[in-house]
C-alpha cells in the first residue's frame, strides 16, 4: 500500500493554510498521493466546501499530485468518521489543524485534532499555522527532543517529509532542573549534564544522516539546562529564528481537561512561529 498524505479539512481558512503543508508533503512521497476529507457535521455548509476543494484540486494538478477529495456524512463523531474514511496504519500521514477553540478551551484540548492524535491509528501531525505566508515550506525547523532511548525514530517520518535538503534543522535537548537546584549546580556538574545532552544529539544527528536520502545540509545541536521546559523551547525558537517547531506528543503530554498548565498548550498559545504536534501509531 502506497503512503499518502491525508488532510482533515474542516472548511475553515485555517484548514486551507494547513493544506499548503499537505500539498508539499505529498509531493515528497513516491506515489505523490493526497487525500482530502471533510465530514458533514453541520458546522459548515456543503456550498462552502466545494470552492475550497476545487482550489486544492487545481493545486494538485499544477503539482502533479494524485488527489482524492472526499465529503462524508457524520457517523458517530468527527474523529471517528475521519478515521473510518482513511487507510489505517503507517501508510497514512494525517494532517489536521490546531487553532484556538471557543470559550478558552485551548488549541488541542477537547478537539478533533486531539482525538486523532490519541487514536494511535495512523501518523498524525496537528499544525498551528502562525505564518501562512510560508506556504507550508519552513526553511528553519526546531526539533526539541526528550532524550528517549529510541532516539529520533518517532519523528523520522515527519522529518523526511518536512525538512528539505536546503533546510536548517536545529536539534534541541532541554534538560529540566528544578528552580532551586538549578541555581546551586556547580559549573562542573552543569558542563557534565550538557555534555550528555550533546552526546545524545550527536547520536540522533548520525541517525538522521543515515536514514535520510538527502539530509538537511545544516544540522545543528543545542543542549541546555532549564527549569521551564516549554519556556526554554520558546526562548530558543526566538533566538534561533526558526519558522517551525515540531513536538512529539504522548498520551501523558496531550491536554484533555487541563489547558493552561499543559506545556503543549502553552507553546501553541505563545509561539511566534508555526508549530506541529506529531504522534505515530
Describe the role of every protein-language-model region.
Residues 95-98, 124-130, 248, 275-280:
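Short beta-strand elements of ligand-binding domains
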Residues 1-48, 65, 139-194, 209-219, ...:
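Small/aliphatic-rich secondary-structure junction motif
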Residues 18-21, 48-56, 81, 196-207, ...:
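Short, solvent-exposed amphipathic alpha-helices that sit
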Residues 96-115, 119, 136-138, 244-270:
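Glycine-rich, Arg-bearing micro-motifs that act as flexible, cationic patches
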Residues 3, 91-92, 121, 139, ...:
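Conserved acidic residues
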Residues 24, 41-43, 51, 58-94, ...:
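Structural beta-alpha unit
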Residues 23, 114, 157, 206, ...:
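Active-site phosphate/pyrophosphate- and oxyanion-stabilizing loops and adjacent acidic/basic residues
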